[in-house]
């Protein structure tokens, strides 16, 4: 249950950041949204019990951003300088701090693809 939990969403895009923030508020979470103009983003994120990274910047969320025992959800999808697929979270840096974290690849992207396929089939059947 996320009711009353402190949640920080990094990113304010119309695709992920804003919709996720609204869904979390509807479930009575206390939501803070960070963006490129946020002052002390690391401190703001470190206050979160749940951190949602949707900034579109490869491995920008470092250990300084994550509170001990936080849940980290990485929605980002990026390619780093070496051509490797990665998320917005530096998974190796935060894995022993966070209580749980979704990896990239292999995290929420798989769920997104499944839901998209489900909606596509549903729309096709409705025709």
Which sequence ranges carry the predicted segments?
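Glycine-rich phosphate/diphosphate-binding loop of Rossmann-like nucleotide-binding domains
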Residues: 1-71, 84-95
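Rossmann-fold NAD(P)-binding glycine/threonine-rich loop
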Residues: 68, 73-127
């Amino acid at each position: 249950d996320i009711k009353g939990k402190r949640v920080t969403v990094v990113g304010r895009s119309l695709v992920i950041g804003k919709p996720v923030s609204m869904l979390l508020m509807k479930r009575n979470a206390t939501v803070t949204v960070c963006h490129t103009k946020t002052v002390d983003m690391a401190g703001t994120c470190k206050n979160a019990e749940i951190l949602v990274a949707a900034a579109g910047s490869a491995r920008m969320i470092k250990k300084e951003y994550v509170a001990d025992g936080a849940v980290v959800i990485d929605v980002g999808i990026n390619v780093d300088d070496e051509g490797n697929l990665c998320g917005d979270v530096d998974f190796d840096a935060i894995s022993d701090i966070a209580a749980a974290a979704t990896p990239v690849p292999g995290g929420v992207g798989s769920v997104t693809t499944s839901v998209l396929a489900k909606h596509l089939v549903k729309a096709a059947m409705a025709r």
